[in-house]
UniProtKB/Swiss-Prot annotation:
<dbReference type="GO" id="GO:0005576">
    <property type="term" value="C:extracellular region"/>
</dbReference>
<keyword id="KW-0964">Secreted</keyword>
<protein>
    <recommendedName>
        <fullName>Venom peptide 4</fullName>
    </recommendedName>
</protein>
Amino acid sequence: IIDFIPQIE
C-alpha cells in the first residue's frame, strides 16, 4: 500500500 498526499508548497 503506497499512501501519499501531493502537496504544493
